[in-house]
UniProtKB/Swiss-Prot annotation:
Gene: HSF1
Official protein name in the record: Heat shock transcription factor
Native source organism of the sequence: Cryptococcus neoformans var. neoformans serotype D (strain JEC21 / ATCC MYA-565)
Family per similarity comment: Belongs to the HSF family.
Principal subcellular localisation of the protein: nucleus
Region annotation (Involved in trimerization) ranges: 280-333
Amino acid sequence: MTTNLYAIAGPSKPTTPTSTPSPRSEPPSPLKSLTSLPTNPLNSHGTSTPNTLTNQLSSTGIGISKPGLSVDENGEVMKVPAFLNKLYTMVSDPEVDDLIYWGESGDSFFVPNAELFGRELLPRWFKHSNFSSFVRQLNMYGFHKVPHLQSGALKNETPIELWEFANPYFKRGQPQLLTKVTRKNNRPSNSGVGPSSSVGGSGAGGGMSTRSASAAAASGSASGQIQQAISQGHEAGNHSTSGKYLITDGTTPGSVPPSHTSAGPLIAPQTLDLSAINSGIAAIRQTQASIATDLRKLQASNEALWRQAYETQEKQRKHEETIDLIVSFLERLFGTEGEGLKGLKEAMRRGVGVRRDRDGREGRDSRDSRFAEDDDGGQKKRRRVGIDRMIEGGTGDGTGEHGEIESPTSDDRLVEIGSNSEYSIPSVKRTSSSSHPISLGQLGSSRFTALPSEDPSPSASGPGSTSYEGLHTTQTNARGAGADVNVTDPTLGMNHLSPLSDTDPLLPSSSNALAPYSSHLPFPSSNSNQSNSFNPSNPSSAWASNPSQPLLSPTSAAAAAHAYNLDPSLLQTTIGSLLQSPAAAQMFLNSLSASAQGQALASHSHPHNPSPLNPNPNGNASTSASASAHGMNTGGMGTGSGTKDVDPTLALFSPLPSHSSLTSQSNDLLKSYSDALTVGEGVDNLQESIDSLVRSMGLDLPNGGSSVGVDVGDGAGVGTETGEGDGEFNVDEFLQGLAKEGEEEGEREVEGDGGVSSSGAGAGAENGRKEDVIAQSGLKSES
C-alpha cells in the first residue's frame, strides 16, 4: 500500500506535479545516502529523482520520497529543517574545507575565519552574510561553542579566532540524527497536543503543511526535550560534564534557555573558570604590588643619591673656597718671589722645628727626612737650602768628622751640602717676643764670626779663650775629640758659600758663638799688644766685667750697636723688609758706610786683618782675635787691600775680605752667580707649579696637631712651632693665627720695633744674591 505524501504533509498550496524545489532553498537532503532505503524509490508520480528524500515504512516496506523528510523508528514522518540540511551539506563539502570543516572526531565542525566565512560562503546558502546571525541560528538549534585556551580571558584574542560548534545529534556520517535536532521556542506550548495528534490533525484537516506540523510538535515538546537532554547525558549530552555552553548574544528572543532548565548545569563550570580567573587576577595584582614597592624603593634610593651628590658638591665648593682663601692669604703674605710658600710647605711637611729655651740651650727633634743611612752605617744629614734652613742653625749632634759634598757640580753645592761635619752655623732664634732684640754684633758674631762646636767642652767656654791655631798646622777640635782638620786643604774652599746661605762650614769653633768675637774687642784690662783698626771706645766692658751676663741681652745689643757705630733701629729691621723696600736697604747701606768698619774700608790706611800665620799654640791676642772674629774657614788671608769702590756690605765681615782674592776668583764667582740664577729660575717655575697645584688640590697639612706660625718681622722667619694640640687640624684657627701674625708684622714694620729676622729671600732678590756672591768670594779668597 502506497501512501501519498501530499496527503500526509503536503504543501499548504497545491503545486503542479512537475514542480521541483529550487536548489538554493531546498538542497538535496543527505538522507538519500541511507542504506536502508531502496535503490530506486518511487515518488507519487512514479518517477525516480536524486533530489528526492525517500524512506520506507518499517511495517510495509513500501518507500516514500519527499525532500527534507525522514521516517523515525515509530514510523512517523519527520522533516529536517532547511538550516540543518544546508549546514550539513556545507560542512560535508570538501571544496570549502578552508572555510568550514569537520573536526577529527566528527562530533563538531570548525570555522577558522569567521569574517571570510561570512563574506564568501554564507551568501551561497543564505540570504545574508552576517556571521552573528549564523551563530544565533546555531544557538536556536541547540549548537554550542566549544571554548579554547587561546580564547580565554588571560590571553589577548588573536585577530583570527577559531570557532568550534558542536551538537549531540550533528555528527559526521550520521545524517539520520538530524531529525532529533529541534528548534527552541519560548512560546507556551499546548500540553494536549503531541506530535502524533498534530500530525493526525493536520492529516484530518488536509490543509497544514509538514513544516507547520513539525513546528507545532517542536513547540509542544520543547520543554520535555530540554529536560530529557539535561537528565540523560548519554542521550542528549550532559552540559555540566562536557564543559560546553550555549551560544547567545542576548538579542534574539528565545536564545536564552529558561532559568529552571539551564541555570543548574551552567553554574558549576562558570564557577570553576571564574575562580581560576580570580586567582590569576590576584597573582597579577600581587606581582603589580611588588613591582610598585620596588619602584618606590628605587625612587627613594635615587632621591638619596641625588641628595648625597648635592651635599658632596656643596662640601667640595666650601673646601675650594677655604683653600682659595688660604692660598690667597699666603700669596699676599709671602709674595710669589723667593722661598715663601716653598719654605712654608717644606716646614709643614716635616711638621717639626727647632725651639730654643730662654737660657740659650737648643733642642733639635729627630727628622727622618733629613737623615739617611750611608754605606758605613752612619747617619748623614741632608739639608736643603730654604728659609727654614736659615733659622735652624744651632749645635747639632752629628758625630762625623768632615763635611762631604754630595755632588761635584756647583748646583749641588748651592742646593744640598752634606752637613755631617761637627761644625755648623749657629741658629739665631728669638726666645720670646720683641722685648729682647738681637743686636747686629751678636748676629754677626753668631753667623759670620764664630762657629760653635756641637759638643762643647768646659775648656772652651771662657769668653776670652781662643779656638784656632796656625793655618799651616793641624788644628784639634776644642772639645778634644781628636778630629784633625787640615785648614790648608784646597777642597775646603769649595764649601765656602755665602754667609747668608744655609751651609755647614768646615772649621771648628768654641762652644760659645759670641765668645770668640768678644775676645778681639778691647777691654780695659786686655793686653796692650792687641791692635784693632776699628777699635771702639771700650764697648764690651759689660761682657768683660760680667761674663755671666746673657750675650743676647739688651745691654749687649746696645753695646754692639755702639761698637759698630750703627743706628740701633736698623738692627731691628728684617732682611725681608730690606729686600722689599729700596729706601730701607739704602738706609742700611748708608749706616754700614758710616760704621767703624765702613770707615776703615774707605780709609785704606789701617790694616784690617793682621797676619794670622802665627803658629803659636797659645795664640797671640791679635791673631787669635782676628781668627776668632772671622769665625769661618780663614785660610791664607793676608793684609787687607781695598779699592775706592767698595761695597758697604763688606763692613759686615769681621775681618774684611781681601779684594785681591775676590778678583782672582772672579770666574768661580761668576759661575756660581749664573748657577744661582738658573736655580732661581727653576725655583720660580717650581713655585708656579706648586701654586697651581695648591689651588686645584689643596695643601698637605700635618696630622700631628702642629700649628704653623709665620714670623717674618720678629726674626723667626718661616718656621714651625710645635704644640700639644689635638690631632685634628683647625682651618679657622690657622687662618686667624696667620692673620694675627700678619697684622703684628705690619705693625712692627711700621713702628720699627721688630726683631732681626734670620730668614731672607736672598734667592728671590738681586741684592740678596749680590751679598751671597760677595760673601762667597770672601770665603774662597781666604782659602
